[in-house]
């Protein structure tokens, strides 16, 4: 009897986990479709043109058409590529982007479960994301892909340090590593008010972490053709694309959670904050030119890191004085 109950519980856990995973994947696909359409429409408006307007009403079905086009294309694997690692790399990148969403609060509870150390979980899992890109660059056996992978690894590691210090400052100020409790602590005053310099540093680091302009060095077309995914087509390229935009949406949501209160007021205002942060990413892409690689490294290690350390020390001092 005990064995049957355990088997029933196991089956329930598997079914529940599968359904929740499906919800996250479908939500991400819809979110990425919305983000790509929003990006193209906003950039078109900034450049005084119309943007996508052919497929569907005012171009609303354009992301669906692009997705179908990618999936229906032939998957071409280079002869000199390491085929197993070549296939694993985009799957790994997309899987990590899904796992990161498991602790993001979309209501009273998170998608999967309310983890007490949700912030630490995000920091730990996000640091693994670089492996998919490195594996893609190495397995493609192409100098452009390899250089793009190396650049991405160096860039993500460099800016993770500064971003980690800013998140530590938020944890210290809030006195918790639970995402839900961090939002609840901002009911009266958003953290952007006392931690405005930290917000600016976190935003710059988020741009670099997601390889967005002006820090899109791993995909620099003029230098590396397309970077680490230059040898990918069809589903492989689509998975990298989905993973990249899922991370952009995640960073937008995290910035709104850490500094703007997230969904502490209501879900609609929380969604508007996330969309506002996403529009900020798009605005930066449309206005700023790309950095040189040496300037990127200089900014990360000699400017952002010392400032992030000063902010962290300042937050610790402020908390000690208040207490």
From Swiss-Prot:
NAD recorded as keyword: yes
Catalytic activity: a ubiquinone + NADH + 5 H(+)(in) = a ubiquinol + NAD(+) + 4 H(+)(out)
Enzyme superclass (EC): translocase
The keyword Transmembrane belongs to this UniProt entry's keyword annotation: yes
InterPro entries to which the protein is assigned, alphabetical: NADH_UbQ_OxRdtase_su1/FPO, NADH_UbQ_OxRdtase_su1_CS
Membrane topology annotation: Multi-pass membrane protein
Domain of life: Eukaryota
GO CC annotations, alphabetized: mitochondrial inner membrane
Subcellular location(s) of the protein: Mitochondrion inner membrane
E.C. number(s) listed in UniProt: 7.1.1.2
GO terms under biological process: aerobic respiration
Gene Ontology MF terms in the entry: NADH dehydrogenase (ubiquinone) activity
Keywords: Electron transport, Membrane, Mitochondrion, Mitochondrion inner membrane, NAD, Respiratory chain, Translocase, Transmembrane, Transmembrane helix, Transport, Ubiquinone
HAMAP family per the UniProt record, alphabetical: NDH1_NuoH (MF_01350)
Job description of the protein: Core subunit of the mitochondrial membrane respiratory chain NADH dehydrogenase (Complex I) that is believed to belong to the minimal assembly required for catalysis. Complex I functions in the transfer of electrons from NADH to the respiratory chain. The immediate electron acceptor for the enzyme is believed to be ubiquinone.
Similarity field: Belongs to the complex I subunit 1 family.
The protein's name in its UniProt record: NADH-ubiquinone oxidoreductase chain 1
Source organism of the structure: Dictyostelium citrinum (Slime mold)
């Amino acid at each position: 009897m005990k064995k049957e109950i355990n088997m029933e519980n196991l089956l329930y856990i598997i079914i529940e986990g599968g359904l929740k995973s499906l919800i996250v994947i479908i939500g991400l696909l819809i979110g990425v479709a919305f983000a790509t359409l929003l990006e193209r429409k906003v950039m078109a408006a900034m450049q005084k043109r119309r943007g996508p307007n052919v497929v569907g009403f005012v171009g609303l079905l354009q992301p669906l058409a692009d997705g179908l086009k990618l999936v229906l294309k032939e998957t071409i694997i280079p002869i000199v590529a390491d085929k197993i690692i070549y296939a694993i790399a985009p799957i790994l990148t997309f899987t990590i982007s899904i796992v990161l969403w498991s602790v993001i609060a979309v209501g009273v509870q998170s998608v999967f479960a309310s983890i007490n150390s949700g912030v630490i979980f995000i920091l730990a899992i996000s640091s693994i994301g670089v492996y998919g890109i490195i594996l893609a660059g190495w397995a493609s056996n192409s100098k452009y892909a390899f250089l793009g992978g190396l650049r991405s690894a160096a860039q993500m590691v460099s800016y993770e340090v500064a971003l980690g210090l800013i998140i530590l400052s938020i944890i210290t100020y809030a006195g918790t590593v639970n995402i839900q409790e961090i939002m609840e602590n901002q009911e009266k005053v958003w953290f952007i008010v006392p931690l405005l310099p930290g917000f600016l540093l976190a935003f710059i680091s988020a741009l670099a972490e997601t390889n967005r302009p002006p820090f899109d060095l791993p995909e620099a077309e003029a230098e590396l053709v397309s970077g680490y995914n230059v040898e990918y087509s069809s589903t492989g390229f689509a998975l990298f694309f989905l993973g990249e935009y899922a991370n952009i949406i995640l960073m937008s949501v995290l910035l709104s959670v850490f500094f703007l209160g997230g969904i502490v007021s209501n879900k609609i205002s929380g969604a508007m904050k996330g969309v506002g942060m996403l529009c900020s990413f798009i605005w930066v892409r449309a206005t700023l030119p790309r950095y040189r690689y040496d300037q990127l490294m200089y900014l990360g290690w000699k400017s952002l890191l010392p400032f992030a350390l000063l902010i962290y020390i300042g937050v610790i001092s402020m908390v000690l004085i208040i207490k």
